[in-house]
Amino acid sequence: DDPKRILQTKVPPNNDPSIFEQELELSMSRLNSKKIDLLAIHGINLPEHLDMTIRPNGCLQIVRRWQKDGLIGHVGFSTHANVDLIIKTIETGLFDYVNLHWYFIRQENERALQAADANDMGVFIISPTDKGGHLHTPSLKLLDLCSPLHPIEFNDLFCLRDKRIHTLSVGASIPEDLDIHLSAISKMDTMHGVINTIEKRLINASYKSLGESWLTTWNIGLPRWDQTPGEINIPTLLWLNNLLEAWDMESFAKDRYGLLGRGGHWFPGANADCLDCEVSEDD
């Protein structure tokens, strides 16, 4: 074992704790490690996932036994849930850290960050490069607006300047993919002014493209996806349109649009395709 390495794995909750433990054993075996430093209960996205985890004789009781045996260090949870459920899970006081989504283009989990900080929890940001806007393949407009930094560097530094955030997840298909993130880390102490300038530039570009009246009101009074005919996720569709209009984030918007209707509780609701068949505009 490498003392400089912190090893994390994720196991989803299960209605049958014995199945949860089997998956935990499988993960441990594949990692070929004597101890898991961090275990995340993966995907507390719905109230029933939380219940499976924390109820008496639930999945967390298995974890506590493993912790007592010295096989697991800290336990957290990962989530794509709405912010109220994230906060409810945080405030159980049963978890040491949380893996969630929060980055420049998506900050609606701000209240969850506040709750995690108040409960002295670690915060791990999920996929800030990919889910933060396909920053590995940025638009020319985004590249220009983020200059002299690359959009990946800007987003990394935007997140890490917030003292409530401790870790960013980084995917790499080749070792060189890590270089730009290491470059961002090397600039943490010198780029505060640049980050502020880029942030203002991005916001100004969005106001220029969309207008102040739209940007200050677009998300007010919108129905939830499960309150809408065809389960169309109107808030997400409008958000994606904002990203497209403001910063030319076409590849990301298309990817997220295509996932709606196929993402289940990880990315709930449907896109607007059903307007062409089963749902009328009058509905």
Enumerate the language-model features and the residues they cover.
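N-terminal binding-site loop/beta-alpha segment at the start of enzyme catalytic domains
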Residues: 1-5, 283
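Secondary-structure boundary/capping positions in well-ordered alpha/beta enzyme cores
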Residues: 2-3, 34, 96, 166
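Structured C-terminal cap/extension of enzyme domains
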Residues: 111-283
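Glycine/proline-rich, positively charged
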Residues: 13-111, 117-125, 129, 147
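Short internal beta-strands
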Residues: 7-9
